[in-house]
Amino acid sequence: AHVDPSTRTPMPRLIGAHTIDIGGIPMAARRAGNAGMTALQIFSAIPKYYNEKAGVKPERVTAFHAALAEAGIARTAVIVHAGYVLNCATPDAEKWERAATALTKELERSTTLQVRGVCFHPGAATDNDRDAGVARVATAMTRALETVDGATKLLVENSAGAGNTIGRTVQEVAGILTSLPPSLRARAGYGLDTCHLFASG
């Protein structure tokens, strides 16, 4: 169906980057503000680990919100990138359980921070069963969204397509999102990595 462009609500033009958080996430917000950014991406915990037990202390939340306000950056202009080790597409039951638990914890931390969303890499279907990999990612997302209440979204990031990684095509990303229960879909979406898009062809 044709949509008249004049009836669309313009989206805010946000410019940001993944910002280094040495000194804590409040410092990431200050660095972003000092660079003139209007958005930023951060890690809520060390990205090389699962961080299934890591939480966010109330004083850290308060300091982060104050730094965002000082920088003139809205909480809704902040994305958290999940840890790199998560593989929600894996057929290995033990590894999947750990990844799904870590994704839920990531959503919990990000909801506590009151940011817009959590962007994560779906992982790899190491058994070469791409459809099953898509289903496993959707199951992990469903668990996280059912466990954690709030407005923070889970965003599937497209992959560069190396090996058996899931999310190299629009169809795979859409397959994940449409596999979610309809009641949860408003809290899910995708993060478009243009470098990954180019690399995947």
Question: Can you name each region flagged by the protein language model?
Answer:
Residues 34-37, 171, 193:
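Conserved long hydrophobic alpha-helices within structured protein cores
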Residues 88-190:
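Active-site acidic/histidine proton-transfer and metal-coordination neighborhood
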Residues 12-16, 39-41, 75-79, 115-119, ...:
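Structural preference for beta-strand elements that scaffold enzyme active sites
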Residues 50-56, 162-168, 200-201:
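Short, exposed beta-strand "edge-strand" segments with a Pro/Gly-rich flavor and a Y/T-containing core
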Residues 2-80, 86-108:
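N-terminal pre-domain/capping segments
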Residues 18-22, 45-47, 83-85, 123-125, ...:
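Active-site beta-loop-alpha junctions enriched in small/polar residues
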